[in-house]
């Protein structure tokens, strides 16, 4: 398996930051009440992940090991500030909706974890691909969880898409069910916990099913050496 395919498999499935590593749960649970919010935070996290991995990989040979963590945090904070300013300028409604969770990307364990575990030990291209696939893995879980919660809670999909994509995206809103009142359990953090648990359980079931279909490798017989005389 090529390195890119292995990185893709790890980021999207085998070592998914949300479903396997269980990192970044605070924004995952708090922001994913709609697809729009989930996608907005996912894109922001993806941009910071790729940017931080590339930057850390470029300077990895010039930063003393004793101060590498503070340097990584400063790099991540600078990139988050850039993303925050861009979102404030071009997606102000989404910026207000996400609120404090945009600057909190600085403390996201996914980003500092990939910078320390992978980017600081590899060249630029593999580090960029690692950030890309880990970011896409996190974004995919955010979007799936956001769609589940929005659909069950409000009976809609892509509500508020205009906050992210512009006024034309208001036409993307789909009313799947008509509720007299919102189902608050799905929209509040307890519903997010339940949703994440269901997604983790589903992944484990799929992994077990795939594992069961794999041919079992026969263990070679172990020959014991005789230590006594005949």
From Swiss-Prot:
InterPro entries, A to Z: NqrDE/RnfAE, RnfE
GO cellular component, one term: plasma membrane
A family per Pfam: Rnf-Nqr
Membrane-crossing segments per the record: 18-38, 39-59, 69-89, 93-113, 124-144, 182-202
Domain of life: Bacteria
EC number: 7.-.-.-
Name of this protein: Ion-translocating oxidoreductase complex subunit E
Cell compartment(s), UniProt: Cell inner membrane
HAMAP family attached to this UniProt entry: RsxE_RnfE
């Amino acid at each position: 398996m090529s390195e890119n395919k292995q990185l893709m498999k790890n980021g999207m499935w085998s070592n998914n930051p949300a479903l396997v590593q269980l990192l970044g749960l605070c924004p995952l649970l708090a922001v994913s009440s709609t697809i729009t919010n989930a996608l907005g935070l996912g894109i922001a996290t993806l941009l910071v992940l790729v940017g931080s991995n590339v930057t850390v990989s470029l300077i990895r040979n010039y930063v003393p090991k004793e101060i590498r963590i503070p340097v990584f945090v400063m790099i991540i904070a600078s990139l988050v500030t850039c993303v925050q300013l861009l979102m404030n300028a071009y997606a102000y409604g989404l910026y207000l909706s996400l609120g404090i969770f945009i600057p909190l990307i600085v403390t996201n364990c996914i980003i500092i974890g990939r910078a320390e575990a992978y980017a600081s030990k590899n060249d630029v291209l593999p580090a960029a691909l690692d950030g890309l696939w880990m970011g896409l893995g996190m974004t995919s879980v955010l979007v799936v969880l956001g769609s589940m919660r929005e659909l069950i809670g409000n009976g809609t999909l892509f509500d508020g898409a205009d906050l992210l994509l512009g006024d034309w995206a208001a036409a993307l809103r789909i009313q799947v069910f008509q509720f007299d009142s919102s189902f608050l359990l799905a929209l509040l953090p307890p519903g997010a916990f339940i949703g994440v648990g269901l997604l983790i359980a589903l992944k484990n079931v799929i992994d077990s099913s795939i594992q069961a279909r794999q041919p079992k490798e026969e263990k070679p017989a172990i020959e014991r050496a005789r230590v006594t005389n005949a």
